[in-house]
């Protein structure tokens, strides 16, 4: 009996993207009406929800926020996350074993699906 490898969904992969801290963003970026990466104004068709993110407010209380990005910025953000991840990941450093890493596979999938 062989073990089945579970591959991350696109939503799982999007959650791997590194989002700037809310205090470094404009009000429009924090509100989801502008891309968190570039500041591009977002439309319903061009926006990608990046999933809930946890942070703290100025009083230290935990809060969630819901960043969004322009779909054209996803490949660049995925590549940046992959460059941060890959040096410390043995499967990602060897072309023969690239697909053995779920994180690396998910980030490469994002780059393909949103190019």
PLM-predicted stretches and their roles:
Residues 1-29, 87-115:
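Short, intrinsically disordered terminal segments enriched in charged and Pro/Gly residues
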Residues 43-47, 79, 98, 110:
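Short, non-ligating residues that shape and space the ligands of small metal-coordination modules
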